[in-house]
Each structure stands twice: as C-alpha cells, then as structure tokens.
C-alpha cells in the first residue's frame, strides 16, 4: 500500500496557517502622557534668574522681537500652531538665537512634539551660554521630554535625572563686585 505525500505535507501546512492567523502585530507604544502647558510652566519656572546670578542678555533684533511678541500673544490665546509659525519665521531671520530656539522648543511641547522640543533645546544648548537661566530652561525642556516618553531611553546620560543634573549645573553665582 502506498501513501500519497500530500497528506504528510498538508497537515503541517494547515497547522502553520492556523498558527499564523493567531499572530498579531505588536501593540503600538503608548502615546506620550504630557500636559504641555504644565511642562512649559515648569520649564519657565526653572529659568527664573536669582539676583545673585550671572545672566547675560544679547542685543535683540526688533523684527525678531515683534515676531516673538506675536508668538507670545498667540500662545496665550491657545493658538499654538500659529505661534509656532511666528517663531519659525523669526528663526529664519535669526537661526542662532538660543532664546528663540528655546521658545520654539517650548512651543513644540505645547503641541506634544517631543522630538521637536528636544531638537530645539539641544540646538539652544549648542549655540548658547552654558550657564544661567536660559541654560536651565534648555535642560529642563530635555528633562520634560524624557519624562514624557512612553518608553524611557536606557542609555548612559539619557535619564531625567541626568538632564536635571545638567540643569542644576547651569547655576553659577555672579562674580563679586568690589
């Protein structure tokens, strides 16, 4: 008696087809849990200058200042996308202004754009002072982004605590004046 090879192949193939139908795609990572308004308030609070602290302020371009004021007004009205557009226009005029980059990072947080917020904050760190209130705001922005990530990055120097240590290192007392 001879057996056909088809049944021997058909049963494992059928079993594989059934198992494949049971598989599912991995679940999407959870959406970031971020209260943008609260995060921006915490960032701005971290940038408050003490009277005993060194705080350097650059000379401002009046056209850029007008756009920054427009963005501030739009943000207050809850029109975050329009505020971002005004800040982007200002950045076209002055792409290296660390304060402007920080304001753009904060605007990105308001629309829950974590990658954009971190990118603009890092640009501000690269192009700005490594001390003072603005430096603290850059690092607090990065801390807020890291805190809001659904899955924290497991790499040395990439934790919320690391960002907060960097933020605290930005505070330097002003030189004594005699």
Residue ranges, per PLM feature:
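Bacterial Sec signal peptide processing site at the extreme N-terminus
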Residues: 16-41
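Sec-dependent bacterial lipoprotein signal peptides
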Residues: 1-22
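Terminal, low-structured helical/coil segments at or just beyond the last alpha-helical repeat
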Residues: 30, 139-178
């Amino acid at each position: 008696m001879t057996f056909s090879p088809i049944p021997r192949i058909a049963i494992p193939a059928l079993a594989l087809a059934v198992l494949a139908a049971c598989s599912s795609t991995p679940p999407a990572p959870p959406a970031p849990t971020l209260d943008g308004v609260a995060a921006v308030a915490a960032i701005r609070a971290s940038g408050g200058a003490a009277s005993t602290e060194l705080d350097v302020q650059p000379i401002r371009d009046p056209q850029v200042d007008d756009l920054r004021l427009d963005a501030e007004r739009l943000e207050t009205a809850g029109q975050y996308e329009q505020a971002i557009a005004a800040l982007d226009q200002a950045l076209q005029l002055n792409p290296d202004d660390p304060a402007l980059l920080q304001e753009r990072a904060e605007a990105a947080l308001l629309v829950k754009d974590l990658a954009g917020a971190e990118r603009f904050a890092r640009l501000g760190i690269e192009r700005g002072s490594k001390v003072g209130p603005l430096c603290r705001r850059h690092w607090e922005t990065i801390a807020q982004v890291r805190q809001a990530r659904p899955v924290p990055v497991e790499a040395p120097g990439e934790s919320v605590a690391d960002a907060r240590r960097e933020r605290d290192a930005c505070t330097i007392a002003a030189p004594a004046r005699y």
